[in-house]
A protein has these predicted regions:
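Gly/Thr-rich phosphate-binding beta-strand-loop-beta motif of the actin/hexokinase/Hsp70
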Residues: 6-26, 102
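Nucleic-acid-processing active sites and adjacent nucleic-acid-binding tracks
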Residues: 27-53
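Short alpha-helix plus adjacent loop in nuclease-associated cores
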Residues: 78-126, 167, 172, 266-275, ...
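Extended, structured, electrostatic nucleic-acid-contact surfaces
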Residues: 2-9, 201-226, 234-240
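Glycine-rich, often acidic, oxyanion-interacting loops/wings at catalytic, nucleic-acid
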Residues: 129-219
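Phosphate-backbone recognition surface of nucleic-acid-processing proteins
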Residues: 88, 219-316, 351
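Acidic beta-strand-to-loop metal/phosphate-binding motif
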Residues: 53-60, 102
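Low-complexity, acidic/Ser/Thr- and charged residue-rich accessory regions of DNA metabolism proteins
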Residues: 265, 305-351
Length: 351
């Protein structure tokens, strides 16, 4: 493309790869004026020579890094969910066609983009993901120990604590039923279990320390059922929450609202959508379960009368989901208003 055409550039799409980026750009008439492949290390030097414009990229690995880098250069980066770029793909799938689709999607006026995360948010998100992986691995290790014991005809009561308390007694008292090799295997798995416990405890402690130093986390933890994990997880996911105009938008993003399938003026609602962050939604649902387990505390909360009313006429699982939705909406209101939760004031919930 000529130098003259490049000066008319209004939008660029980047298909981000591990080592190579593919760029496609359009001018204000929709004419293709840029089609280029660059190395990752040449990102800054390449964009320094381009006119400042909208730069779209899919929400993928390193998208936030690329976005921050381009913003420093004066561009307007837009991180787009992959499902929003798919309708713009023409022809076969290749890197240039993907970049072209991203460039076209980035020009849409009502496009819902992913909010750019700060480095602190990414660090906090990484901590949560490490902890989540460790917890999953610990669960898998415990289940494998149980499976090997069942293969020997030995069953243990449900729960990790029950297995921990009885494992060595089983290995000692029923040594005739367990071969020496199997005993060594189970001992090795138990050592893995102890190591994972230590890693999880250390990671959880680090998250708790961060929650005590972060003002937004402190205010979020004034909400019933919300502790260090939810507060830091929410800050890592949405920052100050200003990407949403109201609390119900945040609840919808979190997937805690009914799926809508309406046509012909008839509204049909189904199960919850389960969109957005599965991890954060799970934490809010777990918080709702904890509150449901302690009905003696309900009168202390501003939403206590509502909770007593719905729990008397709906299935418990529906009540838990509705309560998780309410907690998420309260959390967004707390995050954006700069206030703390008032046990006896319901105005924050209504936003």
């Amino acid at each position: 493309m000529t130098k003259t055409n490049i000066t008319r550039l209004t939008s660029v799409g980047i298909d981000i790869g591990k080592d190579v980026f593919h760029l496609v750009g359009f001018d204000d008439d929709g004419t293709l004026v840029l089609r280029k492949k660059i190395k990752r290390l040449a990102l800054v030097s390449t964009f320094e020579d381009l006119p400042r414009c909208i730069v779209g990229m899919e929400a993928c690995l390193s998208a936030h890094f690329v976005s921050r880098t381009l913003r420093k250069l004066g561009f307007e980066p837009r991180i787009i969910p992959a499902k929003y770029t798919k309708p713009f793909v023409k022809g076969q799938k290749n890197d240039y066609n993907d970049a072209e689709a991203i460039a076209e999607a980035a020009q849409r006026p009502n496009l819902r983009c992913v909010r750019e995360k700060t480095q602190d948010q990414l660090d906090l998100q990484a901590l949560h993901r490490v902890r989540s992986r460790l917890v999953s691995k610990r669960t898998a290790t415990i289940n494998q120990i149980r499976a090997f014991l069942i293969e020997q005809g030995i069953t243990v009561r449900t729960g990790a604590r029950a297995l921990d308390n009885s494992l060595f007694a089983i290995l000692k008292n029923r040594e005739d039923e367990i071969s020496p090799r199997m005993r060594d295997i189970i001992h090795g798995l138990y050592e893995d279990w102890i190591w994972l416990d230590g890693r999880i405890e250390a990671t959880t402690h680090e998250i708790e320390v961060i929650s005590k130093c972060e003002e937004n986390c402190q205010r979020l933890m004034s909400i019933p059922g919300v502790g260090p994990l939810i507060s830091t997880g929410m800050v890592a996911a949405v920052g100050a929450g200003d990407a949403f105009q109201r609390s119900r938008d945040f609840a919808a993003w979190l997937g805690l609202v009914p799926r809508q399938y309406s046509t012909g003026g008839k509204t049909v609602l189904g199960r919850i959508t389960k969109r957005g962050s599965t991890y954060l939604r799970t934490l809010f649902v777990q918080a709702a379960h904890v509150i449901m387990m302690r009905p003696q505390n309900w009168p202390k909360f501003s939403f206590g009368p509502w909770l007593e009313q719905v729990s008397g006429r709906l299935h418990r699982n529906k009540v838990v989901t509705a309560l998780a939705n309410k907690l998420a909406r309260i959390a967004w209101s707390i995050l954006t208003s700069g206030k703390t939760f008032d046990m006896h004031q319901a105005e924050l919930e209504a936003k």
